[in-house]
């Protein structure tokens, strides 16, 4: 993007201008693209995420440092480190007022987006009404509603809204004057760009919109798709849109919740849809797992390649170092070899050491001689006359030539360009403090703490308010005194002292004798200096050779003895170490074996006790199970008899009821017939016939019914006696049996416990 900076008048601004904050200093000028806290104040300042918001906050904190330099009047003009001329103090004033929120504004957008998603997924959710602010189409947001085609070679005109074009007069620079003009600290400039802001935005601008109540446009369901994250749409996004449409169509076919008759159908449809969604999610998860697996394999492969590359670099570096060391060592050996060979050849040429006269003809005929190539180690330097071949240059050897050469040089050679030093970058690309800056800050804090501790003035001790007890010093030890002894003890002490002197003298004499014996060869070697004649010198030389041979033999013998002793000591040490190791391991093994044996004995004893207790409990349990089985059998028998009697009663009652119903039906039929006959006979009968009918009814119905009732009552009384007797027999037998079983079980348990204790005592005595 190209920028053209122009200075404009305030009354005519048809182009889009940007206000910048410019600070001028003596060394130069520094222009910042925005202010420190624009991310909190400016509503048009947008950060992409909470991470960028935090980074902007950190940068603002670093730019607007709250550390203040306060001069020290005592050491104001000092340059010493331990006497600084100023101190750093943390300013309590915060440039951001407390009512300004420092939180990221994107959380509100996320909340509204979550409400929109909830309204899309849940049709019963009522989205709260949003109060939109004035978009200010003709105000500050006017540039957002412009539309202009991108024509790079088209003449730049104002946007589709035509305003009166104001002609800007060209700016003419005033003539330079010797008087220095005042430079303002702030300056407002306008910046005209070749492109609109929308052309360089990472995320295309989305205009504000208002959603009608109870309507969910399909376009809003795709609000989560942003540029680079779903846009431009691919195969996956198209499938997602198709699934969303199918789900909305399926939701439209669902029965209403108010229809209770279709509730089961709605539940089945929802379960089926949920199974389909879960199956789709499982497929997506499997795809993601496969993709992650491939990515992991690729990362592992790259890591292995990088590791191999690093290893190869290390190996190559090590190989190159060893190769350089080898070459250097070989070169040194080669130089030493050449020098030694040269010396040997020189010595071999003149073995007898005779002096030879120089052959000048031979020297001048041999071009490898020192006449043509003298050796510098012998003090000859053939390049002493090299100044004779130096080229004399006019421009380098004369002042006039240097002046002429300097006049042809460009200005920046003689007049160096002064560039403002770049600000020290103390943050990384991610917005975090660098390690060096953090260490500088920590060192400054430590230095400040040390200075505070060093310059801390001790407060004068205040007089005590109350009386204090003075500690009493401990008494000194008594001075030792020497008691006078008797003459006999004094003589004994003097004799002991004399004996000690004799012993010390003898020890010193022995040490001198041993030293003389050790240095006897050196003494004899010193004595050889007094031999002046040839015979004596030869004798001394032979003695010296014999002595040196003896010394070498002695040293060799001592070396062999020391080697043998070292080997023997090593073998002895290893044997002792192995023996002590074996003995310590055997001791530990025996201790562990005894401890394990004790644990085994204790576990065996506990096992026997538990087995005895378990056998007693098992016998009691078996006895109780037998009793319960007998009780259960008796109860089952009683239940079977009760059920059989109950079923018999039910069957009899059912038969009686059935017979009664059938009899009643037949009686009703017969009654109808008899009634018809009776009516007919009634219409024909006489008084005697009426008396005969009454007597027949009494003898045929009333008397048999009374007899039947009496018979039933007798049967019921007889059965009641038998039932009471059966109940008494059953309950009396069961209670006596249960009591008897309990007493027998307690007696058996006591006898078993006594037997187990006796067995345990016998086992302990045997062990």
From Swiss-Prot:
InterPro entries: CFAP91 (IPR026720), CFAP91_dom (IPR032840). Pfam families: CFAP91. It is found in: Cytoplasm; Mitochondrion; Cytoplasm, Cytoskeleton, Cilium axoneme. Residues 8-19 have a biased composition (Polar residues). GO terms for biological process: axonemal central apparatus assembly; cell differentiation; cilium movement; spermatogenesis. Involved in sperm flagellum axonemal organization and function. May regulate cilium motility through its role in the assembly of the axonemal radial spokes. This is Cilia- and flagella-associated protein 91. The gene is CFAP91.
């Amino acid at each position: 993007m190209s920028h053209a900076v122009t200075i404009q008048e305030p009354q005519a601004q048809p182009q889009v201008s940007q206000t910048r904050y410019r600070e001028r200093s003596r060394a130069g000028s520094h222009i910042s693209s925005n202010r420190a806290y624009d991310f909190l104040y400016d509503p048009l300042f947008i950060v992409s995420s909470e991470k960028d918001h935090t980074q902007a906050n950190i940068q603002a904190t670093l730019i607007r440092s709250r550390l203040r330099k306060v001069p020290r009047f005592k050491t104001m003009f000092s340059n010493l480190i331990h006497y600084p001329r100023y101190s750093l103090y943390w300013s309590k004033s915060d440039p951001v007022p407390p009512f300004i929120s420092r939180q990221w504004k994107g959380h509100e957008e996320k909340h509204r987006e979550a409400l929109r998603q909830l309204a899309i997924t849940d049709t019963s959710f009522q989205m709260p009404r949003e109060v939109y602010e004035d978009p200010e189409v003709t105000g500050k947001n006017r540039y957002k509603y412009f539309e202009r085609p991108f024509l790079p070679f088209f003449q730049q005109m104002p946007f589709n809204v035509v305003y009166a074009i104001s002609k800007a007069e060209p700016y003419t620079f005033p003539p330079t004057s010797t008087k220095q003009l005042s430079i303002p600290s702030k300056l407002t400039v306008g910046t005209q760009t070749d492109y609109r802001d929308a052309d360089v935005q990472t995320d295309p601008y989305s205009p504000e919109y208002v959603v009608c109540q109870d309507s969910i446009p399909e376009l809003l369901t795709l609000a989560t798709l942003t540029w680079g994250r779903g846009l431009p749409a691919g195969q996956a996004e198209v499938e997602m849109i198709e699934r969303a449409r199918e789900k909305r169509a399926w939701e439209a076919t669902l029965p209403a919740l108010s229809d209770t008759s279709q509730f089961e159908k709605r539940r089945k449809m929802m379960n089926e849809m949920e199974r389909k969604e879960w199956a789709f999610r499982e497929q997506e998860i499997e795809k993601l797992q496969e993709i992650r697996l491939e990515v992991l394999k690729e990362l592992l492969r790259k890591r292995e390649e990088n590791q191999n590359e690093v290893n190869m670099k290390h190996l190559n570096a090590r190989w190159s170092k060893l190769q350089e060391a080898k070459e250097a060592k070989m070169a040194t050996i080669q130089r030493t070899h050449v020098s030694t060979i040269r010396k040997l050849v020189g010595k071999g040429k003149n073995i007898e050491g005779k002096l030879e006269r120089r052959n000048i003809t031979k020297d001048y005929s041999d071009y490898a001689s020192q006449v043509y190539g003298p050796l510098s180690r012998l003090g000859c330097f053939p390049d002493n006359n090299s100044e004779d071949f130096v080229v004399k240059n006019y421009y380098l050897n004369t002042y006039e030539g240097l002046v002429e050469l300097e006049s042809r040089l460009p200005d920046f050679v003689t007049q160096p360009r002064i560039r403002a030093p770049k600000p020290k970058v103390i943050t990384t690309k991610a917005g975090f403090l660098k390690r060096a800056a953090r260490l500088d800050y920590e060192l400054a804090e430590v230095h400040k703490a040390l200075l505070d501790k060093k310059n801390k003035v001790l407060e004068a001790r205040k007089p005590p308010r109350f009386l204090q007890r003075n500690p009493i010093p401990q008494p000194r030890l008594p001075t030792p005194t020497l008691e006078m002894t008797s003459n006999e003890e004094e003589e004994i002490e003097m004799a002991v002292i004399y004996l000690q002197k004799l012993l010390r003298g003898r020890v010193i004499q022995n040490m001198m004798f041993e030293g003389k014996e050790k240095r006897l060869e050196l003494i004899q070697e010193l004595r050889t200096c007094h031999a002046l004649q040839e015979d004596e010198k030869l004798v001394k030389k032979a003695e010296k050779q014999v002595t040196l041979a003896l010394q070498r033999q002695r040293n060799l013998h001592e070396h062999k003895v020391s080697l043998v002793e070292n080997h023997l000591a090593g073998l002895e040490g290893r044997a002792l170490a192995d023996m002590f190791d074996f003995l310590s391991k055997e001791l530990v093994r025996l201790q562990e074996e005894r401890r394990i044996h004790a644990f085994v004995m204790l576990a065996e004893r506990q096992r026997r006790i538990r087995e005895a207790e378990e056998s007693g409990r098992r016998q009691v349990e078996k006895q109780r199970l037998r009793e319960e089985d007998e009780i259960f059998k008796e109860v089952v028998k009683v239940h079977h008899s009760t059920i059989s009697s109950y079923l018999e009663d039910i069957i009899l009652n059912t038969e009686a009821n059935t017979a009664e119903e059938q009899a009643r039906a037949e009686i009703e039929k017969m009654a109808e017939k008899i009634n018809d006959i009776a009516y007919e006979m009634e219409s024909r009968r006489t008084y005697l016939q009426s008396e005969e009918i009454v007597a027949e009814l009494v003898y045929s119905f009333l008397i048999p019914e009374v007899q039947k009732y009496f018979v039933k009552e007798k049967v019921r009384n007889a059965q009641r006696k038998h039932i009471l007797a059966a109940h008494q027999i059953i309950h009396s037998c069961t209670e006596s049996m249960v009591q008897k079983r309990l007493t027998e079980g307690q007696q058996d348990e006591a006898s078993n416990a006594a037997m187990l204790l006796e067995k345990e005592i016998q086992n302990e005595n045997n062990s």
